[in-house]
Amino acid sequence: MSRYDEKKQLKCSFCGKTQEQVKRLVAGPGVYICDECIELCSEIIEEEFEETRADAELNDIPKPSEIKEILDQYVVGQDTAKKALAVAVYNHYKRINSDVKGSDVELQKSNIVMLGPTGSGKTLLAQTLARILNVPFAIADATSLTEAGYVGEDVENILLKLIQAADYDIERAEKGIIYIDEIDKIARKSENPSITRDVSGEGVQQALLKILEGTIASVPPQGGRKHPHQEFIQIDTTNILFICGGAFDGIEKIIQNRIGKKSMGFGAKIESPKKANVGEILKNILPQDLLKFGLIPEFVGRLPVIVTLHSLDREALVKILTEPKNALVKQYQKLFEMDDVILEFEKEAIEAIADKAIERNTGARGLRAILEEIMLDVMYDIPSQENVEKCIITKDTVEKMVPPTVIINENKKSVKKPINKKSRVKKESAS
């Protein structure tokens, strides 16, 4: 019931504040509620809704085939790697659900290590996985990490990036994904333990062990080194999925040496290392090859899922340029469309861009740099030119840096001419 004082003044039925003490008093059948109580109720309902929604999201895990189907929209090729990642991620979040529901069987973490050359799609795969699952995602560089007490970053700073990605929602961060790039750079310098301290190699591997396995870590909220007079954020890493990626240059020789020992004698087929496909060799990788490369046994044991990626050939690079939702050609066409200009790439031009990337050995990562070189002048000139209808990138534009061809539309007549004034002008009938 509503409350009244002696002067019959209206009061909130919940907190007892008078009409003068609050901004707004909402009346109902025999009851009143103030704006402050409404706000408090809204916060309580929102918190409960967030918890329910988080549980629903966690339970609604896409099937491995559905995960791969979405990965196919953004990442070209690497089918085996996508299948392995889809299964590993699906099993990881099923494991979290089993912990929520309670189970007799304890499921171990399925952290992942990805091996593949530069520009083969390791980082993009990890980013796309996080987007599919709608979980916080952070990328860390293993080369910046050092052992505690030395100049560099502590391993706990990796967790801080994930917490920041989750807007400091610790519960949400504890179900996120962390991608550690350049993991091969923290391999110890030799297979045998050394007397000298390896603070950026084996020391970092030792420091990462507990986080990978699952522990309650203390993270400095501002980053940097720990000191005793600061507060820490506590985060449980048990349900965080770690994906470690690296090029692992030279590991194919270790694999070849191991396989080669089994094929000795007069009848053995000897294949030149140059002719051998690195991607095919990596398919034969075993944990012992990672040990030989310089990862410590305990570290390899915490990365049970090994995923290999192969170098991208010309056909794959052409598809990357044109097919995915975020394809570079589509992005540039959209930019030109904003200036009301049609951008067209000839088939031979796209193939020439792919050939340049292979020649530079940069993989898909180098495609953007090549396109920027080609498109710089035309993106500078065209916005200032009037009546430009179409811009055509040719093979010569890519290989010889010949200016692209533009079609000018004046008085319903299209005139095709190269951008430079010395080139010939060809009149075309209006379509």
Swiss-Prot record:
<dbReference type="InterPro" id="IPR004487">
    <property type="entry name" value="Clp_protease_ATP-bd_su_ClpX"/>
</dbReference>
<dbReference type="InterPro" id="IPR003959">
    <property type="entry name" value="ATPase_AAA_core"/>
</dbReference>
<dbReference type="Pfam" id="PF06689">
    <property type="entry name" value="zf-C4_ClpX"/>
</dbReference>
<dbReference type="InterPro" id="IPR019489">
    <property type="entry name" value="Clp_ATPase_C"/>
</dbReference>
<dbReference type="GO" id="GO:0005524">
    <property type="term" value="F:ATP binding"/>
</dbReference>
<feature type="binding site">
    <location>
        <position position="15"/>
    </location>
    <ligand>
        <name>Zn(2+)</name>
    </ligand>
</feature>
<keyword id="KW-0862">Zinc</keyword>
<dbReference type="InterPro" id="IPR038366">
    <property type="entry name" value="Znf_CppX_C4_sf"/>
</dbReference>
<dbReference type="Pfam" id="PF07724">
    <property type="entry name" value="AAA_2"/>
</dbReference>
<dbReference type="GO" id="GO:0051603">
    <property type="term" value="P:proteolysis involved in protein catabolic process"/>
</dbReference>
<dbReference type="GO" id="GO:0051082">
    <property type="term" value="F:unfolded protein binding"/>
</dbReference>
<feature type="binding site">
    <location>
        <position position="37"/>
    </location>
    <ligand>
        <name>Zn(2+)</name>
    </ligand>
</feature>
<dbReference type="GO" id="GO:0140662">
    <property type="term" value="F:ATP-dependent protein folding chaperone"/>
</dbReference>
<feature type="domain" description="ClpX-type ZB">
    <location>
        <begin position="1"/>
        <end position="53"/>
    </location>
</feature>
<comment type="subunit">
    <text>Component of the ClpX-ClpP complex. Forms a hexameric ring that, in the presence of ATP, binds to fourteen ClpP subunits assembled into a disk-like structure with a central cavity, resembling the structure of eukaryotic proteasomes.</text>
</comment>
<dbReference type="InterPro" id="IPR010603">
    <property type="entry name" value="Znf_CppX_C4"/>
</dbReference>
<dbReference type="Pfam" id="PF10431">
    <property type="entry name" value="ClpB_D2-small"/>
</dbReference>
<protein>
    <recommendedName>
        <fullName>ATP-dependent Clp protease ATP-binding subunit ClpX</fullName>
    </recommendedName>
</protein>
<dbReference type="InterPro" id="IPR050052">
    <property type="entry name" value="ATP-dep_Clp_protease_ClpX"/>
</dbReference>
<dbReference type="GO" id="GO:0051301">
    <property type="term" value="P:cell division"/>
</dbReference>
<feature type="binding site">
    <location>
        <position position="12"/>
    </location>
    <ligand>
        <name>Zn(2+)</name>
    </ligand>
</feature>
<keyword id="KW-0547">Nucleotide-binding</keyword>
<dbReference type="GO" id="GO:0046983">
    <property type="term" value="F:protein dimerization activity"/>
</dbReference>
<dbReference type="GO" id="GO:0016887">
    <property type="term" value="F:ATP hydrolysis activity"/>
</dbReference>
<keyword id="KW-0479">Metal-binding</keyword>
<dbReference type="InterPro" id="IPR003593">
    <property type="entry name" value="AAA+_ATPase"/>
</dbReference>
<comment type="similarity">
    <text>Belongs to the ClpX chaperone family.</text>
</comment>
<keyword id="KW-0143">Chaperone</keyword>
<comment type="function">
    <text>ATP-dependent specificity component of the Clp protease. It directs the protease to specific substrates. Can perform chaperone functions in the absence of ClpP.</text>
</comment>
<dbReference type="GO" id="GO:0009376">
    <property type="term" value="C:HslUV protease complex"/>
</dbReference>
<dbReference type="InterPro" id="IPR027417">
    <property type="entry name" value="P-loop_NTPase"/>
</dbReference>
<feature type="binding site">
    <location>
        <begin position="117"/>
        <end position="124"/>
    </location>
    <ligand>
        <name>ATP</name>
    </ligand>
</feature>
<dbReference type="InterPro" id="IPR046425">
    <property type="entry name" value="ClpX_bact"/>
</dbReference>
<dbReference type="GO" id="GO:0008270">
    <property type="term" value="F:zinc ion binding"/>
</dbReference>
<keyword id="KW-0067">ATP-binding</keyword>
<feature type="binding site">
    <location>
        <position position="34"/>
    </location>
    <ligand>
        <name>Zn(2+)</name>
    </ligand>
</feature>
